[in-house]
From Swiss-Prot:
Native source species: Homo sapiens
Organism lineage: Eukaryota, Metazoa, Chordata, Craniata, Vertebrata
Any one cellular-component term (Gene Ontology): extracellular region
Localization per record: Secreted
Region Disordered, residue ranges: 14-310
Name the UniProt record assigns to this protein: Basic salivary proline-rich protein 4
Pfam families associated with the record: Pro-rich
Post-translational events: N-glycosylated. Proteolytically cleaved at the tripeptide Xaa-Pro-Gln, where Xaa in the P(3) position is mostly lysine. The endoprotease may be of microbial origin. Pyroglutamate formation found on at least Gln-46, Gln-48, Gln-67, Gln-88; Gln-90; Gln-193; Gln-288 Gln-214 and Gln-295, preferentially in diabetic, and head and neck cancer patients.
Statement: the UniProt record of this protein carries the keyword rRNA-binding: no
Amino acid sequence: MLLILLSVALLALSSAESSSEDVSQEESLFLISGKPEGRRPQGGNQPQRPPPPPGKPQGPPPQGGNQSQGPPPPPGKPEGRPPQGGNQSQGPPPHPGKPERPPPQGGNQSQGPPPHPGKPESRPPQGGHQSQGPPPTPGKPEGPPPQGGNQSQGTPPPPGKPEGRPPQGGNQSQGPPPHPGKPERPPPQGGNQSHRPPPPPGKPERPPPQGGNQSQGPPPHPGKPEGPPPQEGNKSRSARSPPGKPQGPPQQEGNKPQGPPPPGKPQGPPPAGGNPQQPQAPPAGKPQGPPPPPQGGRPPRPAQGQQPPQ
């Protein structure tokens, strides 16, 4: 359609200019005087429809090619103004009182009519290589899109509702500071020597990890603190458990991650890892039989504060 309209407009340039100007002036006089008459076809290869009668506001017919602007509507009866001709035709503007989106414009055409006051509408995109969408409505903040690169910084969560931060990729990434009142754990930065801070009292939430050489488990639910999951790496130290529900940190062994222990059952700290995996000690308050023989030849050490195996 665009190519056809452009070609017709270029062919009708020489003959359409003079005749279309004369016809448009005569039609404007007819409409203003209150006697609407049928429009004569303007010069070129694109005839036009007759104008709508007064009293019934309708959109004017589209104008094509390089023809001049149509006549204005009569006073006292608002109608949408016809678009000014560029190299392409354009549909009619929306009716007053019923806001609708005007049709998009393409190419080198002029801008369509603005939306009616009192009822905001999105403006139609202007043709060319620079199109812009409608601005977001105030009162509903939206998060900016993530920025990529080697030094990206995530956006802070909205106040009042702390949530986990999205993972940040890159070699030098730094998360935003937590909001006062509801402390959150800052995410550890990647490397081979990571140190996980102790969880603050209240509602601790753990943000997802940042890119590096180690993996980190999902954050625990607020109100139910759990032991932190193990970290991969050569030298990892586990965090201290929050006050109120003592739990032992999970078993750490080399480069083999292991899931966190279940909440609600206090356990002593299992032996720290070598390469052979050792069984966990029985929970306090529930004495059990002797543990199974260890794997790898190292005998298991009894946990602190628990009864020795009978």
